């Protein structure tokens, strides 16, 4: 399912998905319309914009994750947004988004994120305040390790825009993505 308030983006993403041989594509112009569609149909993957009115991508994600319909709750959500600030990335991740892409989106990057949620799905967890993909991306560290890391690392200012590879590292640190593979030499090296 493609959810975006821009008819152009819906058409563009739909065309890219059809190029990937996806045939059953539904479209919605905001989160409320998408939820209505999902009453009768459960998407395999949701491509979602952030800023839409009256119901934005974060509200939609929270609604899906808190749904009492089992299958629907587990649908992978890939947020596609023109915003790349650190606070937004964290906000989307904490709402239950599986992956995050920054516009403009290339077919290669979209394919990479779709492939990531299919080939490397994260287990879902439930806490008192969260249901969604496990946000723990690394081994759990001790308090002493965390304090040392905090001294060694310079935090990213919340308003600073991030590059797509930095966003990928937040969602999947230490893993290699299919789109990263293209940067490596292929075939015999001389």
Language model segments and positions:
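C-terminal output helix
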Residues: 105-118, 122, 126-127
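CheY-like receiver
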Residues: 119-189
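Alpha4 helix (beta4-alpha4-beta5 surface) of REC/receiver domains from two-component response regulators
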Residues: 14, 59, 73, 84-99, ...
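Two-component/phosphorelay signaling modules centered on CheY-like receiver
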Residues: 7-26
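Active-site beta3 strand of CheY-like receiver
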Residues: 41-47
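The feature encodes the CheY-like receiver
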Residues: 53-54, 85, 103
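Helix N-cap/capping motif at the beta->alpha junctions
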Residues: 27-36, 57
């Amino acid at each position: 399912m493609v959810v975006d308030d821009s008819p152009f983006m819906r058409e563009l993403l739909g065309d890219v998905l059809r190029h990937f041989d996806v045939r059953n594509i539904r479209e919605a112009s905001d989160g409320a319309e998408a939820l209505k569609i999902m009453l009768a149909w459960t998407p395999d993957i949701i491509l979602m914009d952030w800023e839409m009115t009256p119901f934005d991508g974060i509200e939609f994600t929270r609604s899906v994750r808190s749904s009492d319909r089992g299958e629907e709750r587990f649908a992978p959500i890939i947020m596609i947004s023109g915003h790349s600030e650190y606070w937004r990335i964290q906000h989307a991740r904490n709402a239950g988004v599986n992956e995050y892409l920054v516009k403009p989106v290339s077919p290669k990057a979209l394919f990479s994120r779709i492939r990531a949620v299919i080939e490397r799905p994260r287990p879902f967890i439930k806490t008192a305040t969260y249901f969604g993909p496990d946000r723990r991306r690394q081994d759990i560290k001790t308090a002493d390790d965390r304090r040392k890391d905090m001294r060694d690392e310079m935090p990213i200012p919340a308003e600073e825009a991030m590059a797509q590879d930095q966003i990928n590292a937040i969602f999947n640190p230490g893993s290699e993505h299919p789109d990263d593979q293209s940067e490596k030499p292929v075939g015999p090296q001389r």
